[in-house]
Amino acid sequence: MSLWFLVFLSVLQGVTELFPVSSLGHTLLVPALFGMHIDKHAPQLLPFLVALHLGTALALLWYFRERWIALIAGFFASLNGRKNDEGHLMWALIIGTIPTGLVGLLLEKRIERVFHDLRIVAAALIINGVLLWLGDRIQRARAHRPPEKLTFKQAFFVGLAQVGALIPGFSRSGLTMIAGNAAGLTADKAAEFSFLLGTPIIFAAGLLELPKLFHAPDQLADALLGGVLTAIAAYLSVRFLMRYFEGRGRLASFGLYCVLAGLFCLGWFMFHAQPV
């Protein structure tokens, strides 16, 4: 793998995993526009992609480190019968993780095979953009509550939204922010809940494949560099996004980008052969 391509993929993963624009969709579409095909199950790429997932998860853990310490403390307090907001939120995050964990393990590879056509990925990106616009409309129409007041049923619903991101072109963070808006969270709190909810999912995606890092010792240097670059990009991304939504930023801005990018890619691959 060339150095420029390593840097490109690392930064692309770190940014698009957290921005509501579909990391998997971009990983497939952007290289294809330059005539390259990315097979994330290729043996030579697996160690590298494992490191990218771990880099993203570590960036999220570090950014929300104080929040996670409070959540874990509240969780153990709840086990001792002491009800508290942090413990309730931790249980909500656990419940929200269940749908994607189960569906992802059972169906992820099958779904990817069905949606391998880049024109379908581009169409999904367009739909993702429309949903982001609708999410803004929903958020402004709902009464607001803090994440600690989400019911477990609402947390499960938000977690269920992540399942849609198994389809390339749909964004995990985008879908969970929309679901959070529907549950009554403000834009910044929906973003925070989305990132907290996504951390164990992203971590698990890396940890499950971690042994493959050590089956390719000749690629460890590339994987380490990629992981570090992704962690930096992801940290800067989550920092920007939290400030953006705290400053009354809107999902519709990302929705417009997704629609325009999806239309461009759809038109491109209607008239150009897809790389194999």
Swiss-Prot record:
EC number(s) from the headed UniProt entry: 3.6.1.27
GO cellular component: plasma membrane
Cell compartments where the protein resides: Cell inner membrane
Main location: membrane
Membrane topology: Multi-pass membrane protein
GO molecular function: undecaprenyl-diphosphatase activity
Protein name (record): Undecaprenyl-diphosphatase 1
Keyword Cell membrane assigned: yes
Pfam family, one: BacA
Membrane-crossing segments per the record: 1-21, 44-64, 87-107, 114-134, 150-170, 190-210, 222-242, 251-271
Any one of the GO BP annotations: cell wall organization
Swiss-Prot/TrEMBL catalytic activity: di-trans,octa-cis-undecaprenyl diphosphate + H2O = di-trans,octa-cis-undecaprenyl phosphate + phosphate + H(+)
